């Protein structure tokens, strides 16, 4: 069980012409509407790079939920190119790789996320899970410990670390 972060980012500074698609892209109640809004916002190509990155990230998450990994990977790559300092893009791409059992690729993406945000407890936790699936319990325990150091209330990290320490 890995932990997922869903982005509902705010696209700031959108012009009035883009307000409709931006609003649709940011709402999360109707995924079809969100997908159409993000696509329209991206197709206009007029937003600030970090806003376009958020639109790609939101759309990628929808594609991932719908099982369209190919499209999700493309949007995660676009988000990372547009806003290379946003840790959510590699984190969510890592989740996609994890779900596809591509644990080495997941670890690389989670590692990038923690390079960008050293306080990203969920990235440490999920990287620990990927290490554990690959049989590297030492690295997994280290990541679970780091996740707990950042978020002492993380029951998932605590449970995993206790289980590893009892073996």
PLM regions: where:
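N-terminal leader/linker segments that initiate helical-solenoid repeat arrays
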Residues: 12, 16-47, 53
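Terminal, low-structured helical/coil segments at or just beyond the last alpha-helical repeat
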Residues: 24, 141-167
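Conserved alpha-helical positions within TPR/SEL1-like repeat arrays
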Residues: 26-27, 54-64, 88-98, 122-129, ...
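Conserved structural position within tetratricopeptide repeats
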Residues: 40-47, 77-81, 112-115, 148-149
């Amino acid at each position: 069980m890995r932990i997922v972060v869903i982005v509902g980012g705010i696209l700031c500074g959108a012009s009035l012409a883009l307000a409709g698609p931006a609003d649709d892209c940011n709402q999360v109640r109707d995924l079809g509407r969100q997908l159409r809004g993000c696509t329209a916002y991206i197709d206009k190509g007029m937003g600030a790079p970090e806003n376009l990155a958020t639109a790609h990230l939101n759309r990628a998450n929808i594609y991932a939920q719908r099982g369209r990994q190919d499209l999700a990977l493309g949007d995660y790559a676009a988000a990372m190119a547009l806003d290379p300092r946003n840790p959510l893009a590699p984190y969510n791409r890592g989740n996609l790789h994890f779900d596809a059992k591509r644990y080495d690729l997941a670890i690389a993406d989670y590692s990038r996320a923690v390079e960008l945000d050293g306080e990203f407890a969920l990235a440490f936790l999920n990287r620990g899970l990927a290490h554990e699936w690959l049989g590297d319990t030492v690295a997994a325990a280290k990541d679970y410990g780091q996740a707990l150091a950042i978020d002492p209330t993380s029951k998932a990290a605590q449970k995993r670390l206790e289980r590893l320490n009892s073996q």
